[in-house]
């Protein structure tokens, strides 16, 4: 089954988002067949806030590090790190991945949809087989957060060659149903509180990305473990050291043969 096929299974395809090799290995150990990345997790790990084009070089390194894994990889490239569509296409061409996620905002402001569409078109022309997931940030940024604008922007990206549309924080049942009904491509959301995976599928959602949820949960768990030691409480459950080490040993062997 191809990465494209995973978006057409009748039930939403769950894409967990990693920020480094160990997090990706953890997902594979749990049976996932594809891994995305979280730009927030990558930028935060380097001490940078999200959305500031700070992950450009880190993503090149991460894509190369994840390439030996026996799974599909999709990289979150923020806005492509440039306002020049050809420069964005040049950047994406360096990534040995099955898909990318590219957003239509820069520095927390929506950009002209014509520019975002031009980026999608340039990428698709350079790499026709790449799965381009175009993110519409209307709801995420609370800017023109309505179905009409969201659908209008999404259709421009579809016409430019987008294979999927990501609408994070579109959480209302009725709005989600309207969005998926009017976009002729797989629609991607973040987890929606109060809606199960099955219910999201019934609303027409094809893919659910974990986003930064797992990264945030990991930071919370780290602080919780430290508090437990400090306060004399039972330690929380954790993946055993031996399992983590074993995964990395196997990963290192694989990198030597690829």
Located regions from the model:
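Alpha-helix-loop-beta-strand connector modules within alpha/beta enzyme cores
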Residues: 49-75, 110-135, 171-195
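Conserved anion-binding
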Residues: 98-153, 231-247
């Amino acid at each position: 089954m191809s990465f494209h096929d995973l978006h057409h299974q009748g039930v939403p395809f769950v894409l967990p988002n990693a920020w480094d090799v160990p997090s990706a290995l953890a997902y594979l150990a749990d049976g996932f067949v594809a891994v995305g990345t979280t730009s927030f997790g990558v930028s935060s790990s380097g001490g940078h806030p999200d959305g500031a084009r700070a992950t450009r070089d880190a993503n090149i390194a991460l894509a190369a590090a994840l390439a030996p894994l026996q799974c599909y990889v999709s990289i979150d490239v923020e806005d492509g790190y440039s306002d020049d569509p050809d420069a964005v296409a040049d950047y994406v061409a360096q990534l040995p991945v099955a898909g990318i996620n590219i957003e239509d905002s820069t520095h927390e402001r929506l950009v002209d949809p014509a520019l975002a569409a031009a980026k999608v078109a340039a990428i698709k022309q350079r790499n026709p087989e790449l799965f381009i997931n175009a993110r519409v940030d209307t709801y995420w940024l609370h800017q023109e957060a309505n179905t009409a604008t969201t659908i209008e922007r999404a259709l421009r990206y579809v016409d430019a060659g987008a294979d999927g549309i990501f609408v994070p924080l579109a959480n209302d049942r009725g709005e989600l149903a309207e969005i998926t009904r009017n976009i002729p491509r797989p629609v991607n959301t973040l987890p929606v509180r109060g809606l199960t995976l099955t219910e999201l599928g019934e609303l027409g959602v094809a893919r659910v990305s974990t986003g930064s949820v797992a990264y945030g949960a990991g930071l919370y768990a780290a602080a919780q473990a430290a508090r437990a030691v400090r306060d004399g409480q039972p330690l929380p459950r954790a993946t055993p050291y031996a399992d983590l080490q074993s995964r990395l040993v196997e990963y290192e062997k694989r990198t030597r043969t690829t």
